Amino acid sequence: MSKYQEMLDYVKWYQEKHKDENGKTPNPIFEIMVFEYPNKEMIYHKPEGDVPSGWPDTGCIDHMGFYYELDTAIQAMNENWCDIQETCYYAGFILCRFPGLYYAGTSRMYFLWDDEKKGFFEAEEPEIFKHVAY
């Protein structure tokens, strides 16, 4: 199953689980987050001595904004709307978010910058991120 379909299935599951007494469901946003270092050789932050914190060192991170439609967020990444790349960001996520603090669970899609196409395109998420929630 594609990450795209997984995200749509997650939205459907979440909305069904969180219907209110009137049948109203929460609506998601699709947040665009980008960062500097996409390579698989990233190191972990080591705040005290040599003990890894478990947080990958991605360099600068920026939350660029969000859209209410997944397809619009993907198009913004693919077409580098408003120069999301800013000459320094080479990877990013589209994160599915619902209202609230400390998200109970998220679904996300990983993207890498493509110099030839001048946009971000879906890629396999590196193992180093799979235990980190953003």
Feature locations, PLM:
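Short intrinsically disordered terminal tails
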Residues: 1-2, 20, 24, 127-134
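Short amphipathic alpha-helical segments that mediate assembly, nucleic-acid/protein binding
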Residues: 3-10, 25, 70
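Structural boundary micro-motifs
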Residues: 3-4, 16, 43, 59, ...
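Residue-level detector of alpha-helical secondary structure
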Residues: 8-15, 74, 78
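Short aromatic-glycine-(Arg/Gly/Cys) micro-motifs in beta-strand/loop hairpins
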Residues: 14, 19-62, 91, 95, ...
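Predominantly extracellular/luminal cell-surface or secreted proteins
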Residues: 33-37, 67, 114
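A short, charged, amphipathic alpha-helix used as a generic interaction element across diverse proteins
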Residues: 55-61, 67-88
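Short, mixed-charge low-complexity intrinsically disordered segments
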Residues: 79-134
